[in-house]
C-alpha cells in the first residue's frame, strides 16, 4: 500500500539531512507507527508521501501511485492530518466539514457512516467556530475532515501532541475502528507508550531508521538484562551508578534509573552504601520501547 525505496531529503542546499536512504513498506490495512522525537524526519516523510514535498532521491508509492508522477491521484486517495491544526479557525465545525467534502466532490451525508463515531462527539458543537474548540475536539474535527472523502490511506502526523491523556486514548480507539474499516494508517508520534498500539513501528532518529518490527519484536531485541535502581537522591544516584565500574548504560526514567551492566553487579548495593545511599532498591525489569530506542542511539 505504501512503499519507500532509498528516499533522501536535505535542506539548506544539502547541509541539513532530514531523511537518509529511507526504505520500508506498509501493508494494506496496517496501522504503522513512526516513532521518534522532534527533528527525526517524520514530517518530511509525511510531506513526501502526501505529494507536498519532492524527495532529493529515491522512489515512493502510495496505493500503487508514484508520489511524483501520479500526485493528482494520490491527493484524491489519501487523507492527511498535519501536526499543526490547519483547518479554518473562523469557520464553524459544520462549515469546515462541508468545505472539505465539497473539495473532494462528496457530501457529509454520503460518507457519514465512516465519520459517524467521531463526528457525533463534536456534532453538538457544530455551530461553534473551529478556533474555539478544545485541543481534543480540534483533533476529532481534523480527523473527520481527513476522512470525509473515504480515503484508502490515512496519514496522521503527531495527532495527539498537546492533547490531554483522555483524548489521546479516545483518539487511538478511533484509529482501531478505522483500521477495521480496511483503511491503511501511517501515524507518527513522539510518545513511546503509543508505539504499543501499532501493528508495526519504525524507530526514527535524525533521518535514519534504527529498527522496524512489531512492538513486541523491538522489545525482545533488547540485549541483556535491565534493572531499575532507586534511592532517595536520584540526581546523586545517577552520578554514582554511572561511576560504578560494572555499569554499561544508565539513564533516568522518572524516579528510577534504568541500568544495564557489563559484568555482574553483586556489590552494587555495598558500593552505593559507601557513597551514602542507604535506601537502595535494585529490581530486574522488562525493557520498554523507550529503553530500546535509547539503546539503539548508542
Predicted regions and their residues:
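Hydrophobic side chains in well-ordered alpha-helices
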Residues: 111, 214, 237-240, 267-271
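Conserved protein kinase catalytic domain
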Residues: 75, 116, 219, 293-294
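C-terminal coupling/interaction segments
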Residues: 260-298
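ABC transporter nucleotide-binding domain
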Residues: 173-261
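Conserved N-terminal strand/loop that marks the beginning of ABC ATPase nucleotide-binding domains
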Residues: 1-7
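ABC transporter nucleotide-binding domains
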Residues: 9-187, 192-197, 201-204, 211
